[in-house]
């Protein structure tokens, strides 16, 4: 306040001197006054003096007030100058001019176009000066014209969260797109949030048991980790995703969120229908029993929507983690399309591209998303991210930047799928940072490495077998091949979500039982059992029972 008084006295004396000089130079001018036609220097000094003599603001303007983490979304922002007008439209980029600086929205604030046929939300990205902001449209700008009124909502894009979102499909703005009515909830969160503070993070490394044998044994998922899922069309990626959703819900009581980033509309619809058929999503009165929420930003939508839909899905998952203490599974398909959408937005905003045409902010854009996916003292978000590798070039900046964030990779192989072994996870190509004796313990680690060694030896012998046949192998090699083929088939497993297709009941295999079963295989305890008895079963007890059944049927 003292500095304000000093500034006021200095400005008064300065403005008085300036005005006196003007009067002396031109006797016809009247005495100085804050009239509209006063000299520019005198007028500006007068405005600054007026600011200096005014009382300091008691609180920040509503537009700059931080958005609350929770509370129903409203659009009743009534600050001075809250209405702007569209002054330029270039595709998905819209410039909006406001009357004065008081109504100027902060970066990341959402604006709504008024009197538009459909709801059109804009997100502030740049301040250009002259009270003009550059925004990214979250929907198509067809029919938008200059001069159209735009409302400053005073808050970032805010979406519904909580259990009411389970079994529902939302878009980037949190609007339901499944034609099943409004999402009724009292909980809303902004999509732009800071990553959890360092003091809130859980420091321990812990396995997230999935009940899937090949995953838990050879490439275990970290609780709160990030997993890259590599798989082409028709190798069982969708079924594996649905089984993970089902098993996490049963074993950990957690929920799942599926974020379709640049998703094909047909694939998104197919996934939704399959989830209904398999019981992951329930309709009608049983909707509250659903285990998954879906957030789609379809391939035909503008880049702004595709660049933000991943954040919308993550926000829904964060609520389950922070408010309900859940272990949440977050699926992002495809993380490359998230990067691609941000690249399109960056080009439209006029940024100079970086290597291979990607945005210069590639690492920070991806890091802002990935750093929010973590384990806290309240709960965890474990992310499974489908990754597209352009032209199979792993050195491309987009996948290379993504790999730096991953804790595990699950590779689905077409060769294994062609053998009829599902899940078609490649046990040699799939990796995990958790595969360490310090984290898993000696027993689990040694069993996993033993299984991989047998499978690798079998792979090395396949060329010899193809040329010379099994008879030319040594006795040790024959034993290796026999055990490897049994291990390969034992890695198959019937899924709960596939019961309606296969007729076989799904199996959830406990981690301890899983380790003991494969250790018994490596020790040769089950060398006398046929390969067929290891196919599509749960634990080793089922293998023994199936072998006895086969023996009885063959003897009959």
Curated annotation (Swiss-Prot):
Per UniProt, the keywords (alphabetical) are: ATP synthesis, ATP-binding, CF(1), Hydrogen ion transport, Ion transport, Membrane, Mitochondrion, Mitochondrion inner membrane, Nucleotide-binding, Phosphoprotein, Transit peptide, Translocase, Transport
Report the EC number(s), separated by commas if there are several. 7.1.2.2
Concerning SMART domains, the annotation shows: AAA
Sites binding ATP sit at 231-238
GO cellular component terms, alphabetically, are: chloroplast envelope; mitochondrial inner membrane; mitochondrion; nucleolus; plasma membrane; proton-transporting ATP synthase complex
Low complexity: compositionally biased ranges: 1-20
Q: Which reaction does it catalyse?
A: ATP + H2O + 4 H(+)(in) = ADP + phosphate + 5 H(+)(out)
Q: Which domain of life is it from?
A: Eukaryota
Localization, per the record, is: Mitochondrion; Mitochondrion inner membrane
Record-stated family? Belongs to the ATPase alpha/beta chains family.
Q: What is this protein called?
A: ATP synthase subunit beta-2, mitochondrial
